[in-house]
Amino acid sequence: EGVEATHAERARRLRIDDLVCVFDGIGRSAAARISEVTQRPLQVHLVIDHYEHWPPPATRIHLVSALPKGDRQATMLDMATQLGMTDYTPLRCDRSVSQARVQTYDRWRRVLIESCKQSHRPWLPVLHPSVDLKDWIAQCAGTNAVNVIADKGGGTGDQAIENCLLNAESVCLLVGPEGGFSDTEREHLDEAKSEMLALGDGVLRVETAAVALIAFVGRLLSSDGSPP
């Protein structure tokens, strides 16, 4: 019912006996047939044929990034989800140009759902509250997560990152604002156990860096036999 029923009946023009695939966002999907469509309120009734349960990703890919402006936020989350992002945390930085608001999360969740549909990913990414860089580093100190930071001063090779990813249960990908991290923030980063990775010679937009970083790490995980 609700938004999904409207999309099915009016946008996709699905009718009785049409076949659909539905998912719950926590690993379960189902093949179903439309058995009835009622109006006021609009509801689409389904008959489930069979269920499938998909295990969670072997390695969680957690994007922690400064927010780009406006519609670029949705673009970033859309592409990141298609590439295998499992978690997202907005990062508050000294040079951030945008901040997450309560109503923003509702819009982001809709983007994530549509992206999972597009890419046939049965696990919906988890949205976390925004956090300061210093607090994030403190949170990571007690975990076994691998931290990879997009930075022009980092390395460019695969081997160092690939070695860190061996048997990793979670990898956190940090992307700062387009103005870069402040000197104070860089001091905090120096204290953290992390790998710096250069994504090119130019200054990338936040969403470009985030997507490039996820694609890079996802490829390494896949080549190691661990699907992103």
Spans of model-derived segments:
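RNA substrate-binding interface of SAM-dependent RNA methyltransferases
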Residues: Y51-I149
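Hydrophobic side chains in well-ordered alpha-helices
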Residues: A8, Q73-M76, E185
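Glycine/charged-rich beta-loop-alpha catalytic/anionic-binding loops adjacent to active sites
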Residues: G2, A58-H62, S170-C172, E191-L199
